[in-house]
């Protein structure tokens, strides 16, 4: 990298301000910095990462200011304002495309037996490939085991698996050797599999941003696809517990942490409104963003 043989370097923001990486920037002319998942810079974003706040500091260490681009698939107006301000973008051109994807069908079910509902759906769509998102690793393990026992071609993915199994299972799904991926939200970043024709949420996510981002992995080939949430009141309790038990961020003050926790609870409330809505779900999502 220091010798300039790479045209593109992918790097986690956590590494930007390390001495090793700073020397790379000092040795080369950087023509452009692209920030993916830019919503992570905002405390109001669904995946706030303090390391994103250091990106402007890194840019200032370069010999000249490069073109800076920031991209995200899910950002409310409030988060978009934060992206402009916190990344210190200069005279930016802001492009916001429509959030509506007409080929996606959105539905919510409240079955007494979630696995039975999933099994019935898969039997009714025998040739379709898709993702089943679960809230916890334990649920991923349970659902994958049941699917395999019932003869479905399913693999699992969560942060508790060793990297080699995660890579193997991801490849099996992406290259159509496995029909179904059962995963936590650890799966999906950077995955662009065009023929995902359904995304089932076995549990309700903690916010609408995460739900829409995960559901949006369906139908990227433009063909009709299903995005179905299996909702139960227990999902709300589990999410509330996860919010309350989330590890404190040492980079934030106690006041900031309390504010973020309160924000997360409000987002969970909005997600619950979606899951229990009696109106058009597509309209609900478009209104939210």
Q: Can you name each region flagged by the protein language model?
A:
Residues 1-256, 266:
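Helicase motor core with emphasis on the C-terminal RecA-like subdomain
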């Amino acid at each position: 990298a220091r010798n300039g043989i790479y045209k593109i370097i992918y790097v986690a923001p956590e590494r930007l301000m390390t001495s090793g990486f700073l020397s790379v920037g000092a040795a080369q002319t950087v023509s452009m910095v692209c920030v993916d998942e830019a919503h992570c810079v905002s405390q109001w974003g669904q995946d706030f990462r303090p390391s994103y706040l250091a990106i402007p500091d890194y840019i200032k260490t370069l010999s000249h200011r490069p073109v800076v681009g920031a991209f995200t698939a899910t950002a409310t107006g409030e988060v978009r304002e934060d992206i402009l301000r916190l990344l210190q973008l200069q005279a930016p051109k802001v492009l916001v495309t429509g959030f509506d994807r007409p080929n996606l069908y959105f539905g919510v079910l409240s079955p007494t037996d979630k696995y039975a509902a999933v099994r019935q759906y898969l039997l009714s769509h025998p040739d379709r490939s898709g993702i089943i998102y679960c809230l916890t690793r334990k649920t991923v393990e349970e659902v994958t085991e049941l699917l395999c026992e019932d003869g479905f071609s399913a693999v699992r993915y969560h942060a508790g698996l060793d990297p080699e199994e995660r890579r193997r299972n991801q490849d099996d799904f992406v290259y159509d050797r496995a029909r179904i991926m059962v995963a936590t939200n650890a799966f999906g970043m950077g995955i662009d599999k065009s023929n995902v024709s359904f995304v089932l949420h076995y549990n309700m996510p903690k916010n609408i941003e995460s739900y829409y981002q995960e559901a949006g992995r369906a139908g990227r080939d433009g063909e009709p696809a299903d995005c179905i949430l299996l909702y139960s009141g227990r999902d709300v309790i589990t999410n509330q517990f996860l919010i309350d038990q989330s590890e404190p961020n040492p980079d934030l003050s106690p006041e900031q942490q309390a504010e973020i926790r309160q924000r997360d609870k409000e987002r969970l409330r909005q997600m619950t409104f979606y899951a229990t809505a009696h109106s058009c779900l597509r309209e609900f999502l478009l209104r939210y963003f």
